[in-house]
Amino acid sequence: MMRQSLQAVLPEISGNKTSSLRKSVCSDLLTLFNSPHSALPSLLVSGMPEWQVHNPSDKHLQSWYCRQLRSALLFHEPRIAALQVNLKEAYCHTLAISLEIMLYHDDEPLTFDLVWDNGGWRSATLENVS
């Protein structure tokens, strides 16, 4: 119900503003992932030691991780209309995810890739977002 009211309040986006909207969403997501007091569950953003304890090749665990991350991101980012989370890499010390995002008032999908690197998340695609 809250998402519906937020959607109604969001202004229509013109072509020129679409690029800045896409960059803003990606920047805000990266900030959310790297915040020391992130609203996302710790395993989803900074819990890599916890990830390494589990079997990273476990498909059930990977599916659970993607579902949990998708749910949390949809809750915290009202500009996202649809989201698909995919693991690109899930090895003992490497975790790379790809977010396939559809934004409200934007007909083109947005792909945002993140990689866990040296204790934090970095964007593999933020420079290329347009």
UniProtKB/Swiss-Prot annotation:
Cross-referenced Pfam families:
GPW_gp25 (PF04965)
Among SUPFAM superfamilies, the record links this protein to:
gpW/gp25-like (SSF160719)
Does the record's keyword annotation contain Cytoplasm? yes
Give the subcellular location.
Answer: Cytoplasm
Q: Can you cite a GO biological process for this protein? A: negative regulation of protein catabolic process
Is the keyword rRNA-binding in the record? no
What is an example of a GO molecular function annotated in this UniProt entry? anti-sigma factor antagonist activity
Its induction note reads:
By oxidative stress. Low expression in exponential phase, rises in stationary phase, translation is repressed by CsrA via translational coupling to the upstream open reading frame IdlP (at protein level).
Example of a GO cellular component annotation carried by this entry = cytoplasm
Keywords on this record? Cytoplasm, Stress response
| InterPro entries (alphabetical) | Anti-adapt_IraD, IraD/Gp25-like
* Record's function text: Inhibits RpoS proteolysis by regulating RssB activity, thereby increasing the stability of the sigma stress factor RpoS during oxidative stress. Its effect on RpoS stability is due to its interaction with RssB, which probably blocks the interaction of RssB with RpoS, and the consequent delivery of the RssB-RpoS complex to the ClpXP protein degradation pathway.
The record describes its quaternary structure and partners as:
Interacts with RssB.
Q: Which family does it belong to?
A: Belongs to the GpW/Gp25 family. IraD subfamily.
Q: What is this protein called?
A: Anti-adapter protein IraD
Ranked from the top, the taxonomy reads: Bacteria, Pseudomonadati, Pseudomonadota, Gammaproteobacteria, Enterobacterales
